[in-house]
Curated annotation (Swiss-Prot):
Coiled coil: none annotated. Catalyzes the 2'-O-methylation of the ribose of cytidine 1402 (C1402) in 16S rRNA. This is Ribosomal RNA small subunit methyltransferase I. It catalyses: cytidine(1402) in 16S rRNA + S-adenosyl-L-methionine = 2'-O-methylcytidine(1402) in 16S rRNA + S-adenosyl-L-homocysteine + H(+). InterPro entries: 4pyrrol_Mease, 4pyrrol_Methylase_sf, 4pyrrole_Mease_sub1, 4pyrrole_Mease_sub2, rRNA_ssu_MeTfrase_I. The gene is rsmI. Keywords: Cytoplasm, Methyltransferase, rRNA processing, S-adenosyl-L-methionine, Transferase. NCBIfam families: 16S rRNA (cytidine(1402)-2'-O)-methyltransferase. Its EC number is 2.1.1.198. It is found in: Cytoplasm. Belongs to the methyltransferase superfamily. RsmI family. Its main location: cytoplasm. The lineage of its organism: Bacteria, Pseudomonadati, Coprothermobacterota, Coprothermobacteria, Coprothermobacterales. One of its GO terms (cellular component) is cytoplasm. CDD domains: RsmI.
Length: 219
């Protein structure tokens, strides 16, 4: 069997009992980063062989996972943090498994997407954009496609680009409030809510979720 296992965003105490059992019973654990996987497994006192499932090599990595499954091995698939399949190569794995009729099971766990909805108080409808394109023109077009819908938007962003995203939001929708969520579940977790220009600063640290609220005026 192939399991897609949700793992903590940062606080290792967020691991579920079912996830611990599945990781302990698996023959192999697939991961994006062996360093992060080893940190979690060591905390749980679990030793397992590790293989990669990374975006850059997802085709060959998925092929290996499927081969192990056909050999009768149990594979637990993880991501660096949160749920596999959300803005990571787990989505490609699921499509390939479904296309080949290979069964798999999801072991639910922490999700930055779900937590950001709860923390921000965002109401439906909303859209999850994941990580926006790297190129500025494509990022702009993506936002210009969704902003006129006047629904909540949830965006993942790293420390080196979040300032540029806020500047772009300040240009495109300065009247819409934004929740800037940093280092969710971690020691330095921080939630800031304001207009884009109020959240812009020279530098940022940590991983971010940016929530764009609908316009209060409905425009």
């Amino acid at each position: 069997m192939i399991y897609l296992v949700g793992t903590p965003l940062g606080n290792l105490e967020d691991i579920t009992l079912r996830a611990i059992r599945v990781l302990g019973e698996a023959d192999v654990v697939a991961c994006e980063s062996k360093e992060r996987a080893l940190k979690l497994l060591s905390h749980l006192q679990i030793k397992k062989p590790l293989i990669y499932l990374r975006e850059a090599s997802r085709a060959s990595d998925v092929k290996r996972i499927i081969e192990l499954h056909k050999q009768g091995k149990t594979v637990a698939v993880t991501t660096d943090a949160g749920m596999p399949g959300i803005s990571d190569p787990g989505a490609y794995l699921v499509r390939e498994l479904s296309a080949q009729g290979i069964p798999f099971t999801v072991v639910p766990g922490p999700s930055a997407l779900c937590m950001s909805i709860t923390v921000s108080g965002l109401e439906e409808p909303w859209a999850f954009l994941g990580f926006l394109p790297l190129k500025e023109g494509k990022r702009r077009r993506e936002l210009e496609k969704f902003l006129p819908l006047n629904i909540g938007l949830v965006i993942y962003e790293g420390p080196h680009r979040v300032g540029k995203l806020l500047s772009l939001l300040n240009e495109l929708c300065p009247q819409r409030k934004v929740a800037l969520l940093r280092e969710l579940t971690k020691l330095h977790e921080e939630v800031q809510v304001g207009y884009p220009h109020e959240l812009i600063k020279d530098s940022y640290k940590g991983e971010f979720v940016v929530v764009v609220y609908p316009s209060q005026e409905g425009t």
